[in-house]
């Protein structure tokens, strides 16, 4: 993680905290000078976020769940035989419905790596504390507490020291007078290393939810075994995301839930001529806890150092200024653009370090997170749907995991981020234009309040370019569909959930209305008038977008999932499913309209969501008559899917030359024609204790897409979760990758006729549009590569050619062009 910098308010003296080993750590955390707030401070991380508060000058846990943790981030027990001591006051707030415990975990580490983020959520260490049944415990050892023990206020002390035959860890329980009431010790089998975690209601075989709730204070950390790693601290500027498009910078800084009585304002500064200049200030959104800045007339030809400054009260109760710094890189218009494409962050793989490290080595120019930045299970605690303010903080606690994992990459890389169904607490989502989901049996609409959904949109999308049409939809719900130009690539960013029609509008079968377990007798029964996928607003946007080539050479659609149904097995290896109406293979009418628009602009499609990587060429009337889609691997797979038609005896035609199984031309359950070039199926994996190995076995990973603007080539790469990209290991990528197509492969439709070969006397790479004069419909719109173009058409009608340079607004229109039977029969010279 990057170094963080703190400026002392009194003298504005800059002090840089680096990883260091002190002779003796001696730190006392008291909370008297910190205002009442949810966020405990930059030195701590609490789970669940909404259940820990600083109140009454102490830490209070209000959680009903087991294993609610308060982790200390910067002070780590290192691997040596030095001594340590930890002590803290604590007391009972409420007994709860069941007996339970509280105490501390010493030396908490995750199995997979020594990363503080992993330790916070998956660490295991030495457990000690007290139980409201009246005993103290140290692992499996128990000492009865005196009869009438006062749980309202007592003290726990944990120690470690070298002894003649190894190392010993001890625990004492004191009453308020300092009298020792219980004492235990043990010789640990393994080295005592890692973080310390205060825990409310420790999980064990006999524990349950709705246990007691405790408060904590005067946390004292002492001894030479501790080392301070300042980089482990997190906040108060948690991370930033930004985009740069058409010389407009938009940047969002994310903050934790500080007190309403504290400062809510931050500064955005850029270094100019060696000096920091404040370009903008902003006030934190009261619900989303973020600030978004929009700066126009940005010089995108050079790199800019930036920083966000924020006054806050730190973990020690002192006023300080936090600085979060990064770089706004120049627009890479003069070289290939490298896009890191990611999706689906199931918490079992957190903090996804192999993915993060490999991305850093591959050095992308920008990032795309296509959805499911959170899952409801992430963090190991349940979602809270009500009341709205609690639900929002519950969401933020899970969403902050995303920023903690990838923030160091995002601080200096333009990042496109779009929410999907799980981000708004839906397993599947058919938004129907933002309506409220009134009953559990109604699949359409949103379960959460519009205020909650707008917070999700604001935290994840506020830094995107302004929406094409910002008019709110149902209930006043915000929208974020837009376009972004970067590196001479134009990206359309759309939602394929929010406007989508619900299956219960057409489903007549028993059971789940979104699952087809067997073929329908009449497939047309689920295709009725009025069904929507992207919705009219986004279709109109795309029709306009494919004709806007100003400053760009290639076009890409970014959405959450692909426009077809590829998976054959869901959840379990042998769990066959004929058709899934959560896929965007349905509704077919809406799917076909979207693909028809896309192919006219030679648009390449990148999506996620499916948990199995694939490369698919779409077909509408015939196989392969439209564009290509790359579905990227999930960062960390929870719910597995497979595409295994060969095992089911499903007929295949035209298998690719590589001969890999489960590839070729297939028709899906809804009649969509799909050419599957590559599929990254998981095997019949077994659950293993190593979370990263399990992610690897479940086909997790990430994608890279390289856009070569000179050749107009698009190269797709699909890296496994545990890949080593520093070398060229043959198993780094899923089978079938890497794969390269050309921009002009994204209109695969066979020609019915040809227009004359267009030859341009003028600058290279003009934009060409072909318009059918009979129907007045656009046939295609594209920036050609060079000075020559062979337009194909799909009827013998008469056509208009419109060609020119949108940057100069210089155009020529040539009408009444008759098509030819063969390519290159005639030439048409157009001079500018």
Spans of features found by a protein language model:
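Flexible glycan-contacting loops in extracellular carbohydrate-active proteins
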Residues: 181-214
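Extracellular carbohydrate-recognition regions
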Residues: 24-48
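Secretory/extracellular carbohydrate-interaction modules
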Residues: 63-138
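Short, solvent-exposed beta-strand-to-loop segments that form ligand-recognition rims
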Residues: 174-194, 730-742
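Long, structured stretches of catalytic cores involved in phosphate-ester chemistry, encompassing
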Residues: 208, 212-215, 220-224, 244-246, ...
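Carbohydrate-binding surfaces in secreted/extracellular proteins
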Residues: 88, 147-186, 714
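Glycine-aromatic-enriched beta-strand/loop faces of beta-sandwich-type recognition domains
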Residues: 105-162, 670-694
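Short carbohydrate-recognition loop motifs
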Residues: 50-68
